[in-house]
């Protein structure tokens, strides 16, 4: 069974960061080692919250503890999400380097989380660090539209421009770019677009876009987690992309149908493992 070290935020109530990522990856047959960068009562969009960030040095100490008992070499991948400060971002990068030193086959997937995540905004300097330092180390990245623009340093309005930006990013290091949400001026307003790009191939997929009164938090964290889990279990990029598109849709639909604000992960767990509605992905020659 594959193992992933997941470095993200955590909420006690609700689903954001590791609280949105751990269970879906486990449901897909992956062992998850969660390292919480932030521990909060709930995500901040409720307007009231309690909690704090973990010290960057403690992040590295915790991973050193795993290494000391001889299991870090069994880590197959690192997934990083919200990193609240430049020291946390640097610590995450050092952790990735440590994992790769112990297991050269381990890979690193970065969900850049450069904007507001669950009401939390990273400190100044995090965005610049991710843009400048992380691509060279990452094997895959999962920006949303805004984050892709920041990583590419350009405005993106079409699928062709998005593919070109992803390829430019791939030339800096990553092998796979998963665009969690792509705004395309040529797409219907009621569709949600995702994009997966490698050096030689690109696929686009669409699912229904639901009109929530308040959009649930954690959908991006869920998206990255499912994609990573599918890749770890051996799915091709296209198969992982299609499964992610279908499984995330199932969770979002269950949440919408239940008129809930928090993602219905438990209620939709069978759909995460075996989606009943598939949308497919088509090759784009952009």
Curated annotation (Swiss-Prot):
One of its GO terms (molecular function) is pyridoxal kinase activity. Pathway: Cofactor metabolism; pyridoxal 5'-phosphate salvage; pyridoxal 5'-phosphate from pyridoxal: step 1/1. InterPro entries: PM/HMP-P_kinase-1, PyrdxlKinase, Pyridoxal_kinase_PdxY, Ribokinase-like. Transmembrane segments: none annotated. CDD domains: pyridoxal_pyridoxamine_kinase. GO terms for biological process: pyridoxal 5'-phosphate salvage. GO terms for cellular component: cytosol. Substrate binds at residues 9, 44-45, 221. Keywords: ATP-binding, Kinase, Magnesium, Nucleotide-binding, Transferase. It catalyses: pyridoxal + ATP = pyridoxal 5'-phosphate + ADP + H(+). ATP binds at residues 111, 147, 180. Its EC number is 2.7.1.35. Its cofactor is Mg(2+). It holds the Pfam family Phos_pyr_kin. Belongs to the pyridoxine kinase family. PdxY subfamily. Homodimer. NCBIfam families: PRK05756.1, pyridox_kin. Pyridoxal kinase involved in the salvage pathway of pyridoxal 5'-phosphate (PLP). Catalyzes the phosphorylation of pyridoxal to PLP. PANTHER family: PYRIDOXAL KINASE. This is Pyridoxal kinase PdxY.
